[in-house]
From Swiss-Prot:
Family of this protein: Belongs to the ketopantoate reductase family.
Active site (catalytic residues): 179
Name used for this protein in its record: 2-dehydropantoate 2-reductase
Enzyme Commission no: 1.1.1.169
GO biological process, one term: coenzyme A biosynthetic process
PANTHER family documented for this protein: 2-DEHYDROPANTOATE 2-REDUCTASE (PTHR43765:SF2), 2-DEHYDROPANTOATE 2-REDUCTASE-RELATED (PTHR43765)
Organism placement in taxonomy: Archaea, Methanobacteriati, Methanobacteriota, Thermococci, Thermococcales
UniProt organism field: Pyrococcus horikoshii (strain ATCC 700860 / DSM 12428 / JCM 9974 / NBRC 100139 / OT-3)
Length: 301
């Protein structure tokens, strides 16, 4: 399968590297120093495995269309990434493995064929050309917004062959919403207070806030016609327990002085609330506090 990874950061490089390792025709599309290092020394994957992979890597969009584009940019970079690749997006399958909601709609706007995805694999970019695979997880993909398709099944088989445990759902929009609702509670609370995820579960005050945020998100989702295959409340508790030693990605972005994805998590829930004439006061409060923290120059590290 000819695959382009659009936004080859940590997760994109991990997925692309593992696919290239089993013989798929992969091109990583990313930024300067990382791509330069891969072209010089190959892509190194450390942590749960130890691989050196020689794969194509470039900072520009190739002219030839692939079978699949895997979109792994931050959600705030989706527009720029898709517009730069618009000539190859039209009529091409595009799998979004991104946080938040709304990315697949942007793929559709440019005539792409969207596949939604969520993954619990954990990866960090240690240095240019080197990815550390920190947590083995599950990837869930599906025809967006709903349904089944033979190509999606083929992608699942390809991922599994590469060592990425992957399943297909007929309701990927429900899963994307469930994950976003959980992230809307965990990420801003952890980012504002600069605590590990486990502290949210162990502290009665923080857990009660997280539970109310999830309830608010569920109400908004249901009014927008979203159906869940898993209870977001169950997913909240499960995620807090499984990631209790983690500082979430939003907090890490703040510590690094980088923009967070708050606009595409809590911000999107606020947008969808307005569409059905609902209020989202808890999501608004968390969104505003994180935006304030960003503008004040980040956290204590």
């Amino acid at each position: 399968m000819k695959i382009y990874i659009l936004g080859a950061g940590a997760i994109g490089s991990l997925v692309g590297g593992l696919l290239a390792n089993v013989g798929e025709d992969v091109t990583l599309i990313g930024r300067g120093r990382h791509i330069e290092a891969i072209n010089k020394r190959g892509l190194m994957i450390e942590g749960l495995t130890n691989l050196k992979i020689n794969t194509k890597a470039t900072t520009s969009i190739p002219g030839a269309k692939p079978d699949l584009i895997i979109l792994t940019t931050k959600s705030y970079s989706t527009d720029d990434a898709l517009n730069s690749a618009k000539d190859i997006v039209r009529d091409t399958w595009v799998l979004s493995l991104q946080n938040g909601i709304g990315n697949e709609e942007k793929i559709m706007e440019l005539g792409g064929r969207p596949i939604g995805g969520i993954t619990t694999n954990g990866a960090v970019l240690k240095e240019p050309g080197v990815v550390e695979w920190r947590g083995r997880g599950i990837t869930l993909i599906g025809l967006y917004p709903k349904g089944r398709n033979e190509f999606v099944e083929e992608v699942k088989e390809t991922f599994n062959r590469a060592g990425l445990e992957t399943e297909v759902t007929e309701n990927i929009i429900g899963w994307k919403w469930a994950k976003t609702i959980v992230n809307s509670a965990i990420n801003p609370i952890g980012a504002i207070l600069e605590v590990k995820n486990g502290a949210i579960k162990d502290n009665d005050y923080l857990l009660s806030i997280a539970v109310e945020v999830v309830k608010e998100g569920c109400k908004i989702a249901l009014q927008n016609g979203i159906k869940f295959d898993i209870s977001p409340m169950e997913l909240l508790i499960q995620t807090l327990e499984q990631t209790r030693e983690n500082y979430n990605s939003m907090l890490q972005d703040i510590w690094r002085g980088k923009r967070t994805e708050i606009d595409f998590i809590n911000g999107k829930i606020i947008e969808y609330a307005k569409l059905v004439n609902l209020e989202a006061p808890l999501n608004f409060l968390l969104w505003a506090l994180v935006k304030a923290k960003e503008s004040l120059g980040g956290g204590s590290k």
